[in-house]
């Protein structure tokens, strides 16, 4: 909330930050949703906001589309059964380009495989065999898919090569046990690039250099109505964590900065 209040103040009187009980919206208001869909029961005015958005009385962003809050979409991109669908919907060129950017992703489903079958790319016949992989072979990362209070801030992220064997085994077991309520995905871990960054220390009034690792998050906005609607790149957020951090998120030690597009 402090960050949003600061941002609204920089933008002028047209923008205000309201709490979870505010319902006095006016027709045509643009509302930024600063809560996730898993948290609807804890946001008193959430149902009112969604009702007004459905009636097109207000413009709501991000749109309340659960698919965009689930990482398992990445696993569906790699699912061979859906390749024809993706080619038809995305086009062959963009489909291949997207697969170059998205790491191979598996949905961790505890359903038993036939004795002669194996998990694609992994060569394992049971998810529990992940637990016995050597640290060198555990260059894999488990992530809770979404729709959970553990799905942000790296709370539900487990990097195999960074954990002891017992801790990694416990993470695998938890992922299997939580499948019906909070599914996990497994991805190959790609080490983020190292960059030289700087941040401004307001206490010392000086610029401080910081070697770090960066994550880029593009923000797309839908403009136009109905058939004329299209996605437009609105900006890119760079999150730069200290170089010794292996999982990038908006931690207190991170630099969060807009990028030039």
Label every model-predicted segment:
Residues 1-261:
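Domain-scale recognition of functional cores that engage charged ligands
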